[in-house]
C-alpha cells in the first residue's frame, strides 16, 4: 500500500528532529532546472505568479537564491518533519518511532512542485512552489508539463518495491493531477472525509486536510497493507460510511464538532 499526500506551505526548520535518519531526493537534477528558472524571476514576478505578498515574495526569492543541491542535515531537513500544514498536524510525524519512520519511508510519498516526489526522510531545503502555478518552462506552460510522467514513474517504482498495486490517494486534486493515472500501475483508493455542519455532511477543507494526515498516521502506525483494514479508521471521531462509499471512494463521516 502506497500513500500519496500533498506538501504544505508552512515549514518548520527549528523544532528538534525526531530522527537522524535521512535520504536524498531522487529527482534533484530536475529540481535544479526549476531553480534556474525561478532565479530569473523578480520578487514582483514571484508575488504575481504565486498570489502572495511582497514580503513573502522576497523571502521566496531569497530561498531560490540560497538553494543548492548539496543537501546535508546542517542545511536541509527531512521532508516529513519540515512540512507543517494541516495534513502534517494530523499526522504528527514528530511522535513517530523508528519503526514508523521505516514503514513511512517505504509506503508514503509527498508530491512536490519543486522536488517531484519526496520520500519522508528525503532532505529538502525550504521552498514554495505550488504544483498548480503557471511557471513556463521548456516542456510547457506549467509544472504539470514540466514533470510529465516522471512523478508517475517514481510512484510505479515505489509500488513495485513495496509489493502490491494499491495507492491510497490522500493528496489534493491540485497535486494528484501531476500523476498520469492511465500509466499508474496501481489501483487508486480515495478516502473522503465528511464533517457535519448545521445538520448536513460536507467536505470542510481544514478538517479534511487534518483527516488526511490522521489517515496517513493510522496506516503507518498500524503498518497496514490490506485495503479492507482502511475501513477501521476511527481517529478523532470519524467512522466509515458504507452506504456513501462507492467504487474507489471510501467515505468517512464525523458528527459536528463542538
UniProtKB/Swiss-Prot annotation:
Xref: InterPro entries: YaaA
GO cellular component, one term: cytosol
Entry's Gene Ontology BP terms: response to hydroperoxide
Domain of life: Bacteria
PANTHER family, per the entry: PEROXIDE STRESS RESISTANCE PROTEIN YAAA (PTHR30283:SF4), PEROXIDE STRESS RESPONSE PROTEIN YAAA (PTHR30283)
Membership in a protein family: Belongs to the UPF0246 family.
NCBIfam families named in the record: PRK02101.1-1, PRK02101.1-3
Protein name: UPF0246 protein plu0566
Amino acid at each position: 500500500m502506497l500513500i500519496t499526500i500533498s506538501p504544505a506551505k508552512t515549514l518548520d526548520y527549528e523544532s528538534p528532529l525526531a530522527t537522524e535518519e535521512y535520504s536524498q531526493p531522487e529527482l534533484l537534477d530536475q529540481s535544479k532546472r526549476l531553480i534556474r528558472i525561478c532565479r530569473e524571476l523578480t520578487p514582483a514576478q514571484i508575488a504575481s505568479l504565486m498570489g502572495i505578498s511582497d514580503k513573502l515574495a522576497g523571502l521566496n526569492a531569497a530561498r531560490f537564491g540560497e538553494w543548492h543541491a548539496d543537501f546535508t542535515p546542517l542545511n536541509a531537513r527531512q521532508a516529513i518533519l519540515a512540512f507543517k500544514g494541516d495534513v502534517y498536524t494530523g499526522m504528527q510525524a514528530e511522535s513517530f518511532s523508528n519503526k514508523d519512520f521505516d514503514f513511512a519511508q517505504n509506503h508514503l510519498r509527498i508530491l512536490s512542485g519543486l522536488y517531484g516526489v519526496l520520500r519522508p526522510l528525503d532532505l529538502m531545503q525550504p521552498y514554495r512552489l505550488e504544483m498548480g502555478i503557471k511557471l513556463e518552462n521548456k516542456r510547457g506552460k506549467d509544472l504539470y508539463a514540466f514533470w510529465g510522467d516522471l512523478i508517475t514513474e517514481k510512484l510505479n517504482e515505489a509500488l513495485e518495491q513495496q509489493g502490491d498495486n494499491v495507492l491510497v490517494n490522500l493528496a489534493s486534486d491540485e497535486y494528484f493531477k501531476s500523476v498520469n493515472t492511465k500509466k499508474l500501475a496501481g489501483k487508486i483508493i480515495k478516502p473522503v472525509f465528511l464533517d457535519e455542519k448545521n445538520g448536513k455532511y460536507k467536505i470542510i477543507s481544514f478538517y479534511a486536510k487534518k483527516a488526511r494526515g490522521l489517515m496517513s498516521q493510522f496506516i503507518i502506525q498500524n503498518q497496514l497493507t490490506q485495503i479492507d483494514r482502511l475501513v477501521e479508521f476511527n481517529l478523532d471521531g470519524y467512522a466509515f460510511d458504507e452506504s456513501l462509499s462507492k467504487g474507489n471512494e471510501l467515505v468517512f463521516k464525523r458528527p459536528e464538532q463542538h
